[in-house]
């Protein structure tokens, strides 16, 4: 085809690595137990990964965009006519994620991929670096306040200056 117009994105580096880490952690939860959880329990992909499922209201489009510390991959399933639906049960998690899972398994099985004429070696044990300024805190699973010894516990990560400071009152006694 013929290039009609080339767009050069206006990009800039995000300076706060800790905020980026928190956003990534939220996207990891999509894969570790949210709408993209089947990547783990059904498709058995256990390398560190994060992602986002998506479905349009009319179910004409479904997608899954996922990434590891070494690779980003997006899958879109859709029809270029928005009046046509993919079907009642066709969500990002059911239509696009299976294609993502099969593809990323094959890429990791191959052990490398080519990018800008260079070979990138893959390692499913490579994880994201946790920058300074991120802390892990035990919180009450019910109130989300700082946990007391009698609280049902969850562990969450926070920006150091924004961690919960109030102790749970519901389980204080």
Task: Identify the meaning behind each predicted range.
Residues 17-18, 22, 30, 34, ...:
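Active-site core of glycosidic bond-cleaving carbohydrate-active enzymes
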Residues 2-11, 42-44, 48-173:
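Soluble, non-transmembrane domains of envelope/secretory-pathway proteins that act on or interact
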Residues 1-31:
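Extended, non-catalytic substrate-recognition/exosite surfaces adjacent to catalytic cores, especially
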């Amino acid at each position: 085809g013929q290039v009609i117009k080339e767009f050069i994105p206006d990009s800039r580096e995000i300076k706060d690595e800790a905020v980026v880490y928190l956003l990534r952690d939220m996207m990891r939860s999509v894969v570790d137990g949210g709408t993209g959880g089947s990547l783990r329990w059904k498709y058995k992909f256990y390398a560190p990964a994060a992602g986002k499922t998506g479905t349009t209201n009319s179910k004409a489009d479904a997608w899954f965009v996922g990434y590891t510390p070494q690779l980003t991959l997006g899958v879109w399933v859709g029809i270029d006519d928005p009046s046509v639906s993919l079907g009642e049960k066709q969500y990002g998690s059911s239509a696009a994620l299976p294609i993502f899972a099969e593809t990323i398994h094959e890429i990791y099985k191959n052990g490398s991929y080519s990018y800008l004429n260079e070979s990138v070696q893959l390692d499913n044990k490579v994880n994201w670096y946790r920058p300074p300024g991120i802390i892990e805190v035990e919180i009450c699973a019910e109130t989300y306040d700082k946990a007391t010894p009698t609280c049902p516990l969850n562990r969450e990560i926070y920006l150091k200056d924004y961690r919960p400071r109030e102790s749970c009152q519901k389980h204080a006694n």
